[in-house]
Regions:
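Helical cap/lid subdomain of alpha/beta-hydrolase-fold lipid enzymes
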Residues: 16, 20-265
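Short glycine-enriched nucleophile-adjacent loop
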Residues: 1-11
């Protein structure tokens, strides 16, 4: 979003110059003060490749969402009318049951599941540029520990979200192999349950600095904040796991300190 606001999108501008949205025209960098990512898969997540590359899991997930819209049980507008699987935004007419459209979407590269893959994130990052006047901060978490021979494994001392007890070992095991056309080495093993720690630190090819509170913060550079060990991907939006931040108050203090940091630059 920050990159679009600042630099726009040339393809969109050339497609329809008269009716192009202001978002795609760029020139709004003065309205962006800072960008903060929290447990973000900047460079994709190998676990997403198992869903998107295999097609079948992606198809099933899209199909389930589609069925909720068809039956009227979904309270959310999924805004997938271009695929014909949610209601028409102009008429409000519900979409009919259309598994073929769901399959077509699953086979495409036009969904967030693909963007979260290793190769999808790489393509997306080539389209995104840092805004030179904005401040960038990146927070990450980790629920694994070092094992034998450079591999990682789930740290049982941490209170991980139940589904992550399946996905975390999968990420740790998905190393020393090619995934999404890229060789994934052992450094991709540590994770927060859904995002490899290596991916959460900063976007590859972007300027980055390890945060030091004693030094002046400069814009246009990613500041890599200390990794929070013991917190999983879900803990950043749930104060119930008091172990993750030391206490329930620690959860609120995390966001208060983040707010103070942003306001101080």
């Amino acid at each position: 979003m920050a990159s679009l606001l600042a630099y726009g999108n040339e393809t969109e501008m050339n497609a329809d110059k008269n009716n192009c949205s202001e978002l795609f025209k760029g020139g709004h960098e003065k309205g962006i003060h800072s960008v903060t990512t929290i447990a973000s898969p900047h460079n994709g997540s190998t676990v997403s490749n198992y869903v998107s590359d295999a097609v079948a899991p992606a198809f099933l997930m899209i199909q389930l969402l589609h069925l909720k819209c068809v039956t009227g049980k979904s309270h959310n507008d999924l805004m997938l009318d271009q695929w014909g699987i949610t209601k028409d935004p102009f008429t409000g007419e519900k979409a009919g049951f259309n598994p073929l459209a769901c399959l077509k979407m699953a086979l495409s590269m036009d969904h967030c599941g693909y963007d979260l893959t290793v190769q999808g994130a790489e393509k997306l990052n080539k389209m995104i540029k840092t805004v030179k006047s904005a401040y960038y901060f990146s927070y990450s978490a980790c629920i694994t520990k070092d094992g034998r021979n450079g591999y990682t494994k789930l740290n049982e001392d941490y209170d991980a979200f139940l589904p992550f007890k399946l996905s975390s070992p999968l990420i740790s095991a998905s190393v020393n192999m090619f995934i999404g056309g890229k060789f994934i080495d052992k450094s991709w093993g540590a994770n927060d349950g859904i995002v490899p720690l290596k991916s959460a630190l900063y976007p590859f090819e972007e300027d980055h600095i390890t945060y030091d509170e004693a030094k002046v913060i400069i814009p246009g550079v990613w500041y890599v904040m200390p990794t929070i060990y013991g917190a999983d991907h879900y803990d950043f939006c749930n104060a119930a796991d008091e172990k993750a931040f030391g206490s329930r108050q620690g959860f609120f203090d995390f966001y208060m300190n983040l707010s103070k940091l942003i306001c101080s630059v």
